[in-house]
A protein has these predicted regions:
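ATP-binding N-terminal substructure of ATP-dependent carboxylate-amine bond-forming enzymes
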Residues: 1-128, 132-134, 138, 157-166, ...
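Active-site nucleotide/adenylate-binding loops and adjacent lid/helix of ATP-dependent enzymes
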Residues: 2-9, 13-14, 20-24, 28, ...
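Glycine-rich phosphate/pyrophosphate-binding beta-alpha loops
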Residues: 102-103, 188, 244-247, 313-327
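Phosphate-binding site of ATP-dependent enzymes
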Residues: 195-280, 301-308
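Conserved metal-phosphate-binding beta-hairpin within the catalytic cores
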Residues: 218-220, 228-230, 286-318, 328
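Active-site "cap" helix and flanking loop/linker of ATP-utilizing ligase/carboxylase catalytic domains
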Residues: 243-295, 326-351
Length: 351
């Protein structure tokens, strides 16, 4: 008998569009002989609909205008339902949820908390680790405690923020160029590069427009971005290393999803010894942050091959250009087999 799998997509997040494309790819590639797929879309302004239309409309974001395919619905927080609740009281039982949601309100523990209440097995990290991993500052603090190397940094909160004092602190602790980042935004949203004091001040403005907490890091000279995909629960495995050459000043949202100027190398152009070191570091980070299901762990590698942990993504992208499925593909997982493994892991973790 087929299991009913609910794919969540969209969301009130700056990464709404990426989520819609990722979910469309998952829906197209999931094994229909094993799973009955239901699509639950969340609009950018937070409305929830069961969606029965085509995936192309998800990709071009027009799904929200296809009223004939939209039925208001929510995930019931009641374990007696374990499914989707329609306005008329009808309950659609769900065996597993794949929250293909990126960024705030989807990847930060909020949705995971609802799913935990519902009693439905779901793909990915639990509420705690999702929340921790979303916060770049908290992640760095925890990883530093276990000896993971991180880029020199400082952080600030919007409440009581004094830009002059912040600039002075950054210039004392760090060096230009600096990168100014919202602590709780994904896909490089709101990140700016500051080569001087004026750009640092502007960077604070941009970052605080996206979050209440801001992280500032020293830029790493001639840095290469190395990524490792993690798959599994207690027996999690690390993929081969992948490398990103941005083709721009840095790997921002525009480079990732719009301009298509980045180059990707899988496996990365590094020695086997260095690859093993990075993969072991990714495994340590995954365990330290109590992750499960999947994550993508991102590093910087400087011109002397010194390694720095950058960040971790608990629901990485599943678009055609996303690194996570590409990295797992090099480990022998087709896109369809990867989805199946993720769902199996979700149900296993629930047992």
């Amino acid at each position: 008998m087929k299991k009913t799998v609910l794919l969540l997509f969209g969301g009130a997040s700056s990464e709404y569009a990426v989520s819609c494309v990722s979910a469309a790819c998952v829906a197209d590639n999931i094994n229909k002989e094993l799973y009955q797929v239901c699509l639950l879309g969340i609009t950018a302004d937070g409305k929830w609909y069961l969606y029965s239309g085509d995936t192309d409309s998800m990709r071009d974001l027009s799904w929200v205008n296809k009223e004939e395919y939209l039925t208001p619905a929510v995930i019931s927080p009641s374990k007696t339902h374990q499914g989707v609740l329609l306005e008329d009281g009808t309950v659609i039982h769900v065996d597993a949820v794949f929250p293909v949601l990126h960024g705030k309100n989807g990847e930060d523990g909020t949705m995971q908390g609802l799913l935990a209440l519902s009693g439905i097995p779901y793909v990915g990290c639990n509420t705690y680790s999702s929340a921790v991993c979303m916060d770049k500052v908290t992640t760095k603090i925890l990883c530093e405690k276990v000896g993971i190397p991180v880029v020199p940094y400082a952080y600030f909160r919007k409440n009581g923020f004094d830009v002059q004092k912040a600039v002075e602190e950054c210039e004392q602790k760090l060096s230009y160029p600096m990168f100014v980042k919202p602590a709780n935004a994904g896909s490089s949203v709101g990140i700016t590069k500051a080569n001087n004091r004026d750009e640092l001040v502007k960077g604070f403005e941009v970052a605080f427009d996206n979050d209440y907490k801001v992280l500032v890091e020293t830029g790493i000279s001639s840095a290469r971005e190395i990524e490792v995909a993690m798959l599994g629960n207690k027996d999690a495995v690390a993929s081969v290393c992948g490398e990103i050459a941005p083709g721009a000043d840095f790997y921002d949202y525009e480079t990732k999803y719009v301009s298509d100027t980045a180059s990707y190398y899988v496996p990365a152009r590094i020695s086997d010894t260095l690859s093993d070191t990075i993969r072991a570091c990714a495994e340590k980070i995954y365990r330290t942050l109590d992750c499960a299901g999947l994550s993508r762990v991102d590093f910087f590698l400087d011109e002397n091959d010194v390694l720095y942990f950058n960040e971790i993504n608990t629901i990485p992208g599943f678009t055609p250009i996303s690194m996570y499925p590409g990295l797992m593909g090099k480990c022998g997982y087709s896109y369809s087999a990867l989805i199946e493994k993720l769902i199996e892991n979700a149900c296993e973790e629930k047992l």
